[in-house]
Design a protein with these regions (language model features):
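Low-complexity, acidic/polar, glycine-enriched regions of mature
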Residues: 1-165
């Protein structure tokens, strides 16, 4: 197994304040939320080193499509358990210029002082759904092959926007 990771995530999140301030008063179902997040393909770093970074970037057509973008279409609140709030998210994921609908469970973790919240989740996608041919580095003479399925795991920390900023 090899994995790629990025520490650089951009975007915005607008969320109903009641979800963070008084989740016990929120009923299950759709909530008011907007979000868009992106990751620069070039910021993804492989566990296997720079050679695999280049292979991955080429497979993802990084020069033509430099960003991976997720746009939230719907967020449905399921339940709150202490500082953890559980949701189902639906949206569009664009990779290599190809957009697909995705849905996955999301957990929101509130800090005690409510200054920051963390969204985390996991979903699976197939490279071929985004017209990406799973890379097989030529230096390995076909000995290394990558499967089609990819597990996307994310953790996105957001802070409250201060008034006037």
């Amino acid at each position: 197994d090899w994995h790629a990771e990025s520490q650089l995530v951009g975007g915005f999140l607008e969320l109903d304040g009641a979800l963070v301030n008084a989740p016990e008063q929120v009923k299950p179902g759709k909530v008011t939320a907007q979000a868009e997040t992106f990751v620069a393909v070039r910021s993804l770093k492989c566990s296997s080193g720079k050679a695999m970074d280049a292979v991955m970037q080429e497979a993802m057509k990084e020069k033509q499509h430099p960003r991976i973008v997720f746009k939230l279409a719907e967020l449905a609140f399921k339940e709150a358990k202490g500082a953890l709030l559980h949701f189902d998210a639906k949206g569009s994921l664009t990779v290599s210029g190809v957009t697909q609908s995705v849905s996955f469970p999301v957990t929101l973790t509130r800090r005690v002082d409510q200054s920051r919240i963390t969204f985390s989740g996991t979903t699976g996608v197939k490279m071929t759904d985004f017209k990406i041919t799973p890379p097989a580095p030529t230096a390995a003479v076909g000995l290394i092959k990558t499967g089609d399925e990819v597990k996307l795991t994310f953790e996105w920390v957001v802070a409250k926007k201060e008034a006037g900023k």
